[in-house]
A protein has these predicted regions:
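A glycine- and small-aliphatic-rich helix-loop capping segment at beta-alpha/alpha-beta transitions
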Residues: 69-79, 125-132, 153, 159
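Amphipathic alpha-helical blocks and their helix-capping loop/short-beta junctions
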Residues: 184-246
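Glycine- (often His-adjacent) and acidic-residue-rich active-site loop
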Residues: 59-95, 143-145
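Contiguous mid-protein beta-loop-alpha structural module that forms a pocket-lining wall or clamp
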Residues: 151-206
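Hydrophobic/aromatic residues within transmembrane alpha-helices
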Residues: 57, 70, 122-123, 182
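Short, flexible helix-coil linker/hinge segments at the edges of structured domains or between repeats
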Residues: 84-88, 130-162
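Glycine-rich beta-to-alpha active-site loop
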Residues: 100-144, 169, 179, 190
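Conserved CoA-thioester-binding segment of acyl-CoA-metabolizing enzymes
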Residues: 1-58, 98, 244
Length: 246
């Protein structure tokens, strides 16, 4: 299974790995309806294909994994009176997020560079969230008056090192998580030395062997570790008025 090289998502099967490569670098891989459709169809096909043992999602560009949903597409659609079409865009995106969260096979997201908004939607719900030292993440939607979506308002409270207060902090502030922060709260499951080498071993040896070979330790303490007590004290309240007063 392959797609043409000008597709916004390159789809292939390498050995026993279904590979999704986000291929819209000029737009920092922001997700549009075509990309969501391609990813969804590939995942549906591989789910019941015994020859595919695992799924990899990555980017062709080292600058960005994915900068989020295509906000310009949605804005232009609303202004053009295409409300139902834009509603369908979000329905399809959220359905894809749910599919990833419940996927029965290892779903390995390799995150290098920018990971924002919808980029977390196609990565943070998977079984393996593998980052490099160049990765950083945020949910910046509050800055444009939008909710923390793509399931992250739920997931960010439940990552192994997170809490409801930490999830509220991440969503309400749009805080930019470093690679150390991503490991601290459990958004990332593994930190690796090199994305390219890891991917080659993932395809050739399987995810567990590749992680054994390439996982490294975090080199510096996460900022969130030092702020954790203050975040819990401030963002554990149930309303913005109470948070602001704290």
């Amino acid at each position: 299974m392959t797609t043409q090289t000008d597709s916004p998502v390159l789809v292939s099967v390498r050995h026993h790995t279904g590979v999704l490569e986000l291929n819209r670098p000029r737009a920092l891989n922001s997700l549009n309806p075509e990309m969501i459709g391609i990813i969804t169809r590939a995942l549906e096909q591989w789910r019941d294909d015994d020859s595919v043992a695992q799924v990899l999602i990555t980017s062709v560009s080292p600058k960005a994994f994915c900068s989020g949903g295509d906000v310009r597409h949605v804005r232009d659609g609303i202004l053009a009176g295409k409300e139902e079409e834009m509603d369908r865009f979000f329905t399809d995106e959220y359905s894809m997020n749910h599919m990833i969260a419940s996927y029965p096979k290892p779903y390995v997201a390799v995150l290098d560079g920018i990971v924002m908004g919808g980029g977390l939607g196609v990565s943070a719900h998977g079984s393996h969230r593998v980052i490099t030292e160049r990765a950083w993440a945020s949910m910046p939607e509050m800055a444009i008056g939008y909710i923390t979506d793509v399931g992250i308002s739920y997931a960010s409270q439940r990552w192994p090192g997170s809490s409801p207060a930490m999830g509220a902090f991440i969503g309400l502030t749009g805080y930019r998580l470093t690679e150390a922060d991503m490991m601290e709260v459990g958004l990332a499951t593994h930190l690796i030395d090199d994305a390219g080498d890891f991917i080659e071993d993932l395809v050739g040896l399987g995810v567990d062997n590749a992680l054994d070979e390439h996982t490294i330790e975090v080199k510096e303490e996460a900022r969130l570790a030092g702020w954790r007590d203050d975040i819990e004290a401030t963002f554990s309240h149930g309303s913005w008025a109470d948070i602001d007063a704290a």
